Amino acid sequence: MKNLRAVYIIWYRDMLRLWHDKIRLVGAIALPLLFLVVFGIGLTSKMGALGPGVNFTQFMFPGIIGMTVLMSSFMSGVSVVWDREFGFLKEVLVAPINRTSVAVGKTLGAATVAMIQGTIVLLFAPLTGVSLSPGTVLMLLPLMFLLAFSMGAFGVLLATRIKTMEAFQAVMPMLTFPMIFLSGVFFPLEGIPSWMSILTKINPATYGIITIRQIALGTTSGTTFGLNLFGHTMSLWNNVGVLATFGVVMILLAMQSFSRQE
């Protein structure tokens, strides 16, 4: 019970920080919308239809939702580095609680913040021509949370090994931007060069982006905007399984890393 309360307090602290930092929320939403407007409106007429009744803006919109969730959850690891530099993390680590609770609380906080931001972007669906029924939204939310939790655990794991804010700010863009561009946010994964195809398949974000897109656009069969792995067309549940496995591995490693913190 004590450890569960510790998870809640750490999670709640991240919620308070988000509530009192409105500029952070606005900035996190403005960048994805900028991508959507510049690339979507600017290139839709040039790209043509990318699927049955799907133009480039509609294709890109689910990817932008995934990108928002990915960036926000992954970058939330910066709070771990921040807390270390200002001494708060040391106080938490010497508290009479299991250190794994800290990793879980931080990851849940990162995932919840990312979910809030992704849900706000989701509200812009009518402007892109994407029609989302209440049932579709209810299916999207747990998928967004799974992506947020997996990437949040990855970010927290890296943050436990990075000692300064400067180093974190240098490393994170080197990881987030390749993951975004190689996950199919801005282009279909069919017909790309073989070397790039390999990179997309080892990119964990790919499986989250594809799943969100298939649900949002109603192509859950896995044949449209899908991914072939070893000659097998990945189904929606295959993609969920890969992403969930990655998330479990990352949170276990993050918990282990926190237990070794000094």
Task: Label every model-predicted segment.
Residues 10, 28-29, 60, 64, ...:
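Residue-level recognition of transmembrane alpha-helices
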Residues 1-31:
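Aromatic- and glycine-rich beta-strand/loop motifs that create alpha-glucan
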Residues 39-47, 150, 159-210:
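Transmembrane helix segments
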Residues 32-39, 56-128, 174, 180:
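Hydrophobic alpha-helical transmembrane segments of multi-pass membrane transport proteins
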Residues 5-12, 185-228, 237:
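Short hydrophobic, aromatic-rich alpha-helical segments embedded in or entering the lipid bilayer
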Residues 39-48, 71, 125-133, 162-164, ...:
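Short helix-capping/hinge motifs at transmembrane helix termini and TM-loop junctions
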Residues 40-41, 214-262:
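Alpha-helical transmembrane segments of multi-pass membrane transporters/translocases
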Residues 99-177, 232-255:
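Alpha-helical transmembrane segments and their short interhelical loops
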